[in-house]
């Protein structure tokens, strides 16, 4: 295993920059019984390679919500790609900060229960922001503070524009047995239009 206290140091010493061929190199590994990719990003580009990951015979554990909330065609394509070769695509970390919510919802449905409603606080970021905001600190400063503390998505506009909650709702709805598309969820953005296309540096 890896000692938690040494993770940052080992990453600095041993990490290898992505030069584009990492997936082929992983697929070529023959000295291990199983290989696993951990996707802890919010990258759309990486989510678009999930089928390739399956085709390399690699398991995938993902906190990335993009594939699980993609259009139904791609979502089922990814599911089928892993199922066909007996590999796992595990994505419980996409909703609930690691709590077994996806698994619980799926287990209820598969045991014959009818899920009629799901309710909760679906954005820890927005919950924190509105708990803190009392007018004494500008809202944009609170957003910056939340980002610095790792409470937001890599780009906090994903929290503020509603897309992060939309993705979680789509994932949970699908786990509940609904056939739903992302554009079925009505989203109202809190991000002013003039800030939506700026770089992250310019946004802050």
Where on the chain are the PLM-derived regions?
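N-terminal glycine-/serine-/threonine-rich beta1-alpha1-beta2 phosphate-ribose binding loop
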Residues: 1-55
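Hydrophobic beta-strand scaffold residues
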Residues: 60-61, 89, 153
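A generic secondary-structure micro-motif detector
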Residues: 38-40, 68, 159
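Substrate-binding/catalytic subdomain of NAD(P)-dependent oxidoreductase enzymes
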Residues: 132-133, 140-204
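Rossmann-like NAD(P)H-binding beta-loop-alpha module
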Residues: 83-86, 90-149, 163, 171
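Rossmann-fold NAD(P)-binding glycine/threonine-rich loop
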Residues: 43-56, 65-93, 97-108
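A general structural motif
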Residues: 33-34, 57, 86, 115
């Amino acid at each position: 295993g890896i000692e938690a206290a040494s993770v940052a140091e080992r990453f600095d010493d041993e990490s290898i920059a992505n030069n584009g061929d990492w997936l082929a190199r992983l697929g070529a590994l023959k000295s291990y019984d199983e290989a696993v990719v951990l996707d802890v990003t919010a990258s759309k580009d990486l989510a678009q390679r999930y089928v390739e990951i399956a085709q390399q015979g690699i398991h995938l554990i993902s906190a990335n919500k993009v594939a699980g909330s993609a259009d139904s065609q791609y979502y089922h394509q990814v599911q089928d790609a892993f199922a066909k070769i007996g590999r796992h695509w595990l994505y419980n970390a996409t909703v609930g900060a690691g709590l077994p919510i996806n698994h619980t919802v799926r287990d209820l449905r598969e045991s014959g229960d009818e899920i009629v409603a799901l309710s909760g606080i679906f954005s820890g970021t927005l919950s924190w922001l509105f708990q803190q905001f009392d007018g004494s600190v500008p809202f944009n400063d609170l957003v910056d503070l939340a980002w610095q503390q790792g409470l937001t998505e890599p780009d906090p506009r994903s929290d503020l524009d509603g897309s992060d909650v939309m993705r979680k709702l789509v994932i949970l709805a699908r786990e509940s047995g609904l056939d739903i598309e992302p554009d079925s969820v009505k989203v109202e953005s809190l991000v002013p239009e003039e800030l939506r296309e700026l770089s992250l540096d310019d946004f802050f």
